[in-house]
C-alpha cells in the first residue's frame, strides 16, 4: 500500500508513509497532539477514531478505521477516560451590625454573613447551594467552572438573641454542595 495518510476528526495528523509492504508495521511515521478541553474533562473522557487511507498496487483506494486495542470490538473508537475531581471550597465571613452604635451586641441586632465559593476541582460544578443550620441562605449558582470564584451570590442575616448576648458569641458553620457533570 502506498501514499498512506491518516485523517482524524479531532486533530491534524502529520506524517505520511510512502509505501508499506504486506505484514509490515510502522508506528513512527505519524504524530498528533490533542489539547484536552474543559468540555472533555466535564464529559469524563475523549472519544476518537482515526482513518488510514492509501492506494493498493492497482490504484484502488484502501481505508481502515482505528481500533481501541483495549476492547474486543473491532474498529471501535478509542476512549481516553479522566478521573473527575469535583471539589469546592467555602469561606464564610460575618459582619456585626451595631444598629444602636453602642459598641456591644444587643438582642435584636443582626449579623450579616457573606459566602465565597471556589471551584477547586477539575470539572464544572452545577447547582451549588449553601445550607446553614442557623440561617436561611439565599442564592444559588447555576454553574461554576474550575478555578471560578463567586463572592456575590449568597447572603444571610442572623438576628442576635439574648442567649447569644449572654454566651458572648455566635458560632455556626455552613456547608456548600453541588453536582459534578457525571
Kindly give the residue locations of the regions a language model identified.
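Exported/extracytosolic protein signature
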Residues: 1-182
